[in-house]
């Protein structure tokens, strides 16, 4: 009996199926617990019912299907970086009351904090100690009257050599002196002589090593005798007059506070750093030696830069001339009236005498 090719194919399929069924047992295998098949394995599938016109054997790869894209977890955007605000400069405890007092007067902010933070941690006792010593001796131990005649001029000031220095200074700063004389009527010889008496034409700007801000701030916070403990032994019999010292010091401290406040306002308004403020023993500043409370009223911008800097010649000359003019100085005044107005600048007869005598010598050098 002949076997057709189609029948042969059917027999072959039966044999193959039997072999596949026997293989797991022969190899000691076990039924897989899931449908996972090693990647790359190829199995044979039976043909579809309709045959599909093929030989009934198809291959299907059981390799891993392409994985579905994993869900992307959104990454949180980093929090916006914040720049830490710089902390306010530390103000030493001893200046805290001064800071609060300035703030109560409307003077506060980072620039004020920076000024106060720049002060040494301990006040200087010198300015208040010196002031109390002078007042104390005048009250309790006044000097006896002297039989010697009072000097007419400051010693060594009214000389031809100094007059020449003043004339040279006027020539070197001719524009500043000319403008001040035209505007305020103060003669250049008078203005230059005043600057010579005050600061030797700007060569001697301070009597102490402390700047004016430190000097005045120290006085402003020195309100009790303990604040000048180093000076008390210099006051004869001070134990008997402690009540007077305790009563006097707050008054001087209040005066110093007003000058300190005026100086802080000047530093803020005219952009003047404290290290640019050498001063007298009680805080006068500049070539013309203004107390700070006079700067806002009488300070003048001589060079037109929009600020008052009494350590520049144009501003110093304009400011001292403005001060005298505001007190009545004008061209053509009598010598007596000029003398009286110079005493308004510094209440001293010898002071006014010296300026006028030196100015006469300067004028003679034209």
Residue ranges and their predicted role:
Residues 2-13, 20, 25-279, 283, ...:
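Cell-wall glycan-active module
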């Amino acid at each position: 009996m002949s076997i057709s090719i189609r029948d042969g194919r059917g027999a072959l399929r039966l044999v193959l199926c039997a072999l596949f069924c026997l293989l797991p047992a022969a190899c000691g295998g076990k039924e897989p617990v899931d449908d996972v098949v090693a990647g790359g394995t190829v199995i044979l599938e039976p043909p579809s019912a309709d045959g599909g016109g093929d030989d009934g054997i198809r291959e299907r790869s059981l390799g891993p299907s392409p994985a579905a894209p994993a869900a992307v977890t959104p990454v949180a955007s980093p929090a916006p970086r914040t720049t830490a605000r710089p902390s306010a400069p530390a103000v030493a405890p001893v200046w805290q009351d001064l800071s609060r007092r300035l703030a109560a007067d409307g003077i506060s902010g980072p620039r004020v904090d920076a000024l106060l933070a720049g002060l040494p941690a301990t006040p200087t006792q010198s300015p208040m100690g010196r002031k109390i010593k002078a007042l104390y001796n005048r009250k309790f131990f006044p000097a006896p009257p002297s039989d010697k005649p009072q000097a007419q001029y400051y010693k060594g000031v009214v000389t031809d050599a100094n007059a020449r220095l003043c004339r040279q200074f006027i020539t070197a700063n001719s524009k500043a002196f000319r403008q001040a004389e035209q505007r305020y009527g103060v003669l250049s010889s008078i203005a230059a002589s005043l600057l010579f008496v005050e600061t030797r034409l700007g060569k001697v700007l301070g009597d102490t090593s402390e700047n004016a801000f430190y000097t005045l701030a120290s006085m402003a916070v020195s309100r009790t005798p303990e604040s000048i403990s180093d000076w008390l032994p210099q006051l004869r019999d001070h134990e008997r007059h402690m009540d007077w010292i305790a009563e006097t010091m707050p008054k001087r401290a209040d005066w110093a506070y007003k000058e300190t406040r005026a100086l802080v306002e000047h530093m803020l308004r005219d952009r003047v750093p404290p290290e640019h403020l050498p001063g007298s023993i009680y805080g006068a500043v500049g070539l013309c030696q203004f107390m700070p409370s006079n700067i806002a009223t009488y300070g003048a911008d001589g060079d037109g830069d929009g600020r008052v800097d009494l350590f520049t010649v144009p501003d110093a000359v304009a400011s001292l001339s403005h001060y005298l003019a505001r007190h009545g100085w004008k061209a053509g005044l009598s010598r007596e009236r000029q003398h009286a107005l110079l005493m308004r600048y510094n209440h001293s007869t010898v002071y006014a005498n010296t300026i006028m005598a030196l100015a006469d010598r300067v004028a003679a050098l034209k």
